[in-house]
Amino acid sequence: MSHKIVKIQPGANYTGTTVNFDRSVMQIQAMLEKHNCSRIAIQKDMRGELPTVTLLFEKANLPYIIEFPIIYEKRRNTPDKLRMDVSGRIIHDRIKALLIEVDLNILDFSQGMMAFLAIPDKTGRPEALQDYVLENKGQIASGTFDITYQLPSGRV
């Protein structure tokens, strides 16, 4: 799934952040390292019109993927302003909240991070489980979805 593009109003949550994007990413990486994640990688693609940033990591041989949303703050008389700092803080706070539940033994790591579990999409590229479920929610709701037919053979 491609990165989500969101337009927010001035004054919306997180628009007052003073933490830049790179600092948020470093803090997320530190949280993941504290939880013994491995192969942590940041993939930035600034070649196109829209900058995309993806965080990839593993824990207990399970791959995870987090795509940072592309957030623009609406402006009246000027072009909308790219706010990756807001994107970074939102993802930072979400990961922090999930890992607090892990620290308190409410969830184990794989439960807490299940939304970000990387599974192959129809082309074989990694996709977050939350996005995969969203794309297939009609089939899931109707009871016609069978993940065994969606995965490459031998991956069940």
Task: Walk through the language-model features, giving the residues of each.
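Compact, well-ordered interaction domains used in eukaryotic information-processing assemblies
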Residues: 20-73
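Intrinsically disordered, low-complexity regulatory regions enriched in serine/threonine/proline
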Residues: 67, 72-156
